[in-house]
Amino acid sequence: MNKPLKLVVPLAVVLAQVACAANAISNVPGAEGPPAMLRAVSRGGSSPIQHVIFIVQENRSFNNLFMGYPRAKTQNYGYDTNGDKIALHSQDLAQDWDINHFSPAFFKACDPQKKLPGTHCKMDGWNSEGAGFGSPANYAYAYVPRAQIEPYWTIAKQYVLADHMFASNLDGSFIAHQYVVAAYASHAVDSPASYWGCEGGSQDTVQTLTAKRTYGSSIVACFNNPTIGSEADADGLSWRFYAGTIDGDGGLWSSYQADSEVYNGPDWTTDVINPPSQFLTDIGAGQLANVTWITPTYANSDHPGLNSSTGPAWVASLVDAVGTSKFWNSTAIFVMWDDWGGWFDPVKPIYKDYDGLGFRVPILMVSPYAKRGYVTHVQYETASVLRFMEDTFGLSQLGAADARAKDPAADAFDYSQKPRKFKEIPGAKPPAFWILQER
């Protein structure tokens, strides 16, 4: 719910337990709801972090954006299903075709050596995923030229880049965006046929994935799982989710559109904010929630097929807005791409459960306490950002993904250091540019 923005006592003891209610899918073999919620374990010492910002971009593998980055695990070639070695080619960030990135594409690209789909990957099936009209030969075997994404490389050089970051889920954006708020998606897989969430009612369903990674029955694409937002409400913390709209309703990347409690309650109009550029207006007015998610418009998303290249400038502008604000010394920013988007990557995902891990994706960690120019090789996943939120604010763990996920605080941050002065990111644009763009 809407509430005054709260100054958090680091590692505060949570006084209220949040009810754990999973979507009922008992007809799915091997399906389980989220486990009983666990208390977060205090990591000891005081954290200066009062605000966590989770910026979610779209559909890029680590190798696609950071091929050749110093000290990071990348590769300039791959193999196809015929055993042929394929040299990676450069591909503009702005393109008008897309690559299949749902679960069938994951299983094909992985090319498993074992019976269980998506495990023990040979990582040679990228030529089998399928791509849209106009795609070139060897479409997936590509990287974006550094000059087109310089703000991302600049942020990495100044802060932290993780080269063993994986999506918690193995499929596309609808499920990925449940993991960024709930670390769980009720065994759902891929995306609904029409609306992406509760707006579609009981007729809008999504398929499920069983424990054996076979396709199960369908469920309504409107979930009732605990989220970071519901925990924050229970603990008196403020949160905001900035997203675009489609025909006046939540956009495809608006996670809480598929959350029954939020979509059908007051939070939908008070804490789910549009358009995304409103974040720039809010922080300019001295307003920043304890927990913030920012999803982009289509044009600023980095998503293939949209023929736009403004994503790097958008992210740089968001980081600059925080860095030049009064909140800089109390903020941690995570910039993550939600799924691999069909692009080649050489690092095999480790099997964790029915839905993960997915392929490797980039994440940037930005804070005055983030290590400078650090490439971490620790294995992280989408839910690691939620684990950071939980451990920072003393919240409960939501499900299996965040329970197993590593908190980046111990590895990527140094709270004993004096907060670093912010250095503006080249390529950022003023708020007025983004406000006008969204009109």
Regions found by a protein language model. Give the residues of each.
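C-terminal motif of bacterial Sec signal peptides marking the signal peptidase cleavage site
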Residues: 16-19
